A protein has these predicted regions:
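Interface amphipathic segments
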Residues: 1-110, 117-184
Length: 184
């Protein structure tokens, strides 16, 4: 359901024009992704004066879910938080159309987005117990990653644990944005 509301300007506002606010209410509905039924839970999205507010957006399937809450705007302090629980990484790589590498495994943790319109401060803190890289199962991955705006890539720092006494530290970039110097 979508509702458009014309707000009168505040009396002390320098800009005396009315403001259009858009309120979107999402209702519970099934969603099929790769032949699997997920459920979109009730939530709301508000658009007003360049701000996008997302309240309690959730897509879930049993114990697996993606939960999105927060605000995207020009204000660098506004944050959008994405919580993952047992969420298959392969879906994310398919959606982002990242073909050079293939990460799979069920991730649990947080993804934070700030200052999306400028420096794009994006970061993750994830645990993937059954992590695979290019179809090779490696073990449990503890991963921190963040967007590096200067590199136009995602810096990934983590540790992969095969067992309690064997692990590998990983560090590197993924470049999801094509630039002339990265053309095939």
């Amino acid at each position: 359901t979508t509702c458009f509301v014309m707000e009168e300007p505040e009396e002390d506002a320098a800009d005396s024009k009315p403001v259009l606010r858009t309120e979107i209410a999402l209702h519970e509905t099934p969603l099929v992704i790769n032949d699997t039924t997920w459920y979109v839970r009730p939530s709301s999205v508000t658009l007003r004066k360049g701000k996008i507010g997302i309240d309690n957006f959730e897509v879930e399937r049993g114990s697996q879910y993606v939960h999105l809450n927060g605000t995207v705007s020009q204000d660098v302090t506004d944050t959008l938080k994405l919580d993952l629980n047992n969420f298959e990484l392969g879906y994310i790589f398919d959606i982002l159309n990242i073909e050079n590498v293939k990460f799979t495994g069920k991730a649990t943790g947080q993804f934070n987005i700030c200052d999306l319109y400028s420096s794009r401060m994006l970061s993750t803190d994830l645990v993937i117990p059954d992590f695979s890289f290019n179809n090779v199962r490696l073990g449990r991955l503890n991963l921190f990653s963040e967007w590096d705006d200067a590199q136009r890539g995602i810096l990934m720092l983590g540790s992969i644990y095969k067992n309690d006494s064997t692990w590998t530290d990983v560090s590197g970039y993924i470049y999801p944005v094509r630039t002339p110097e990265r053309e095939p």
